[in-house]
């Protein structure tokens, strides 16, 4: 793509910059892992998006962070594999496909399983294509030659092998348990598929009569329809109010069934009446109580949420219709004594919106305790553990693992990995295997499929060729280096990948887990359809470009924190890119057809040259260090400050002196430094803004085909000059102070004014004298005086900088009262700074723990502030004379 054009287009247009570049990168195969044994591998597997539709801002954020990591590592010389892929997303995709069929007046049952699955695969192909297009728009450097899908044959083989091995170890079993049931889609749900909403409900207070006629016992419920399945009433064993009733029975109202009063510590004595109804088939806690007391389980609902024959006269009613009818009957019977309004959290299906029913069902489960134990033990091994960033999320993860429940893995769906279990038609024998039974005609396969998270848990190694442990990619690229994901799926995905990785590969699936938060709107609200505050990343890209969106997303929050999305801030980033574009145009217009090999940094350098090269070194160090710590925000801010302030606002302006001067050697050195600094800066910025940096870099003198594979900048000690940097800081302080004073008294820079500088000592005097051309160029004095023994002139505006005092005699413009007030404000500022730094230095904890260089830096600040404060005091005293 080598550019023959000398200059960039006059205006920055993100659409024309980004157009065609991604395809050019793909054709160059810059994103494909090479397997080069001389290079260290670096692997990330993308968290697979669901093939259900568009990617949202959360995906854009998540994948941008991964792209930053992989682009950086590629430039640092690693053999990078960033493996793309997508998730079949069982219930989500099936719901979408069924919805589409309903529009045609068809149900999945009309089609049958095989035909329905054909429709689901058609959906997958269509939406997988959309997702790839969106990845391209964001600019993601993915290795498409290794793209995977959770229902690919290789991944399906891995799923079956894992299921069979866990079953053979006794870690997968089939049993009756309470699960989250969606009556609308008629399937079990994982906890993450249940959305809890605050809804207005009620406590229904009822009197259950004691069977012996001696009275009644009062209790309350929010789900009266489940009382039809009650098999006990429970009290706390230490509750003196009810001890005499333990062992007695009550008669279940309406139903007439006699049920026992039992004692169980599950009951909270101080909550309500201290009495709870126990419905083992319709509540997870009641299920556990029922197991402890060997209570029967009476299921009173059908899978569609209607009442069944066990509900007696309510048989066939919808559960909520039953509630109304039952409440009416209870009132008429005198059993219902109060309906108390009550706001409470109710689970809803993420997919259908239906109220989720705790429901007794025969399902397949993974026995979690032995698997979790290994994962917990891993975190005690410093060299082998998974590192969470930020580290506070490790405790979140461990707490969940320590209190883990068995995992329900079966789903009543058609789209997904069908459970590899068969039941003998005559004997009922269960066969579990990776292959179907030889006499298949005598067996029926389990109709259910596995929870989507079951296959997702194998993603880091199934995508690399496992269970073939000799697969080249598995041997080279596993375990992976980093996982980037949101804190909302630590439990449901991260934890499961860790214990499955340990169980089947013997090692952690990834070294680091970088946790980010959620994307929220400017008011801090979660983006949702109901609020109408969602933003399509493709719309952001169309308006401001991928580079602007990426830079905002990656620098807008710290690790682990939520991100407040602001279109205004994306626009500000676009303005930043526009500034880079204009600065690059200036550099390119002054290259004079310079070739890459002609860049020469050995010539004599000005203080500005030495300073910008030193600042570049500092920026390279800061960006690299922060990238290694996943502090993308800090890295981005370092780049922003260097580019905007140091390079654009100061160095480019100072470079105009030699560029427009007569000294040819100085011109050549300045051109070389401009080319070198812009080249290195574009490389540092490339992971954040891949499109515009490639475009600019292609116009610069360069070697190599693409910036994507250009070497990452490293600190060059031969270009480090801290003394020159200090000199430049003094010049910048002087120029900035003069500009501020002129602004205060409305004196334009074009108007020449007298300027006097009192140097602190001979060394400062020598510096300022040597660099006086910069002061004359940027301060525009009619006369410049620099001495060590100057007396402050009357009616002069004053500024105090490190090592010098500035005086601008503006007799006609100065107001002594205003100048006095200004200096008093300065004095107050230095008083606070002195107090702050002295408080820090008097803190024994700080002095004991901080590195010597940091303490020395604070002492230098203290001395500087003391000197500046004294100079301000002296100037105030002079004004009083």
From Swiss-Prot:
**Which EC class, in a word?**
ligase
Keywords on record: Aminoacyl-tRNA synthetase, ATP-binding, Coiled coil, Cytoplasm, Ligase, Nucleotide-binding, Protein biosynthesis
Instruction: Place the motif 'HIGH' region on the sequence.
Output: 49-59
Role = Catalyzes the attachment of valine to tRNA(Val). As ValRS can inadvertently accommodate and process structurally similar amino acids such as threonine, to avoid such errors, it has a 'posttransfer' editing activity that hydrolyzes mischarged Thr-tRNA(Val) in a tRNA-dependent manner.
Give the catalytic activity.
tRNA(Val) + L-valine + ATP = L-valyl-tRNA(Val) + AMP + diphosphate
Q: What is the lineage of its organism?
A: Bacteria, Bacillati, Bacillota, Bacilli, Bacillales
Q: Which family does it belong to?
A: Belongs to the class-I aminoacyl-tRNA synthetase family. ValS type 1 subfamily.
Q: Which Pfam families match?
A: Anticodon_1, tRNA-synt_1, Val_tRNA-synt_C
GO biological process annotation, one example: valyl-tRNA aminoacylation
**Can you say where in the cell this protein is located?**
Cytoplasm
Spell out the GO cellular component terms annotated for this protein, sorted alphabetically and separated by semicolons: cytosol
Instruction: Please name the GO terms that the record assigns under molecular function.
Output: aminoacyl-tRNA deacylase activity; ATP binding; valine-tRNA ligase activity
The UniProt gene name for this protein comes to: valS
Looking up PANTHER family in the UniProt record yields: VALINE--TRNA LIGASE, CHLOROPLASTIC_MITOCHONDRIAL 2 (PTHR11946:SF93), VALYL-TRNA SYNTHETASES (PTHR11946)
Tell me what this protein is called: Valine--tRNA ligase
Annotated residues that bind ATP are located at 529
Which superkingdom is the protein from? Bacteria
Q: Give the coiled coil ranges.
A: 810-881
Q: How does it assemble?
A: Monomer.
Q: Which species is this UniProt entry from? A: Bacillus anthracis
Kindly state the positions of the motif 'KMSKS' region in this protein: 526-530
The UniProt record lists the EC number as 6.1.1.9
Mitochondrion listed as a keyword: no
Q: Which Gene3D superfamilies match?
A: HUPs, Isoleucyl-tRNA Synthetase, Domain 1, Valyl-tRNA synthetase, C-terminal domain, Valyl/Leucyl/Isoleucyl-tRNA synthetase, editing domain
Comment field on protein domains:
ValRS has two distinct active sites: one for aminoacylation and one for editing. The misactivated threonine is translocated from the active site to the editing site.
